[in-house]
């Protein structure tokens, strides 16, 4: 696709249904693969990251039907210990979730060997945060920089459960340990410094795992999995991804004259930090038609243009909105007062250093802001000017810059706009449709 050129001015109107939740899509594929029987998945995200997970599973003997936007995906499970040693390197593409969850899934496959690799961006991302806790269970994982960087080699072992404190509040780390715990000797207890998204716990229980969650435990949010329970194929309905909905939520609030309804959005409490911040900003947000779909809370969200107040975020809120910080930096530019984001150093080890990239690209559009070691300080009431900017291959940066372009004067050219396809393949088409409505 290359570059996309957007002009400031105009407004957006209509309804939009965002793609399926990326986190839930990955997990539905993985858990279906190690279950017995068939798992059917409605609404699975047909984007690059889940496609990487599906390709890795196929390489290990799992039958996964074609993934596109038109139908239900079927996964024929091979059981808890049925994954085959692959004949080739498992290519995780750009997907950190694929690589980190695969580490947990494969570490306990005794006597089998696996090699995980990815693109240039993924090879730069830290994996020791998963590999080191797995090593406490007896995993043998090697790679560059002492097993911190891909390519990573896994020599499957018989793992032992135990109590593991994770170094960061990360659903990927927690999920990898829970996956490893399914076939370990003895129970595995995972204690986090703060509560991370809980899709794995919800879905593993639905598949039949013996798993207890204690989000308010005295030592910290805790999940305990006991091995031995057979998983059984399920029918999974994937709600819309709130991280993708965030771009439309902010666009509606900052583009004059705009009103949008975002349909079928997952509002799992471990993911709704963005809604808490919008409330802090005084946004006129309506949560409509709340319901429960396959164990996940879902709603429609209606929002319209409105003046906004500055916000401050940090601490335990960050894991609940870590993927939304790039678009929140755009919202901060339009707010009254100075917004402060702290405790978000995790963004420096995403697909890109998102703090540095967003600061660099917004400055190219005339923004004034301070980039700190773990966040940003952004004065509000700023006017942006159209410019040539670059996603730097990051999907969330690409879509955040699109919203910034809508409130800038003049034209903005966004290079490497195709990055949006990692999580939202139809984003540019949807934007054009909402502009025409």
From Swiss-Prot:
Matches recorded under Pfam families: EPSP_synthase (PF00275)
Binding residues for phosphoenolpyruvate: 22, 96, 125, 172, 354, 396
Transmembrane segments: none
Active site residues of this protein: 323 (proton acceptor)
Pathway noted in the entry: Metabolic intermediate biosynthesis; chorismate biosynthesis; chorismate from D-erythrose 4-phosphate and phosphoenolpyruvate: step 6/7
Residues reported to bind 3-phosphoshikimate: 22-23, 27, 170, 172, 323, 350
Protein role: Catalyzes the transfer of the enolpyruvyl moiety of phosphoenolpyruvate (PEP) to the 5-hydroxyl of shikimate-3-phosphate (S3P) to produce enolpyruvyl shikimate-3-phosphate and inorganic phosphate.
Cell compartments where the protein resides: Cytoplasm
GO biological process: one example: chorismate biosynthetic process
GO cellular component, one term: cytoplasm
Main location: cytoplasm
Family according to the record: Belongs to the EPSP synthase family.
Organism the protein comes from: Synechococcus sp. (strain RCC307)
Identification of the protein by name: 3-phosphoshikimate 1-carboxyvinyltransferase
Annotated EC: 2.5.1.19
Subunit structure: Monomer.
Database matches in HAMAP family: EPSP_synth
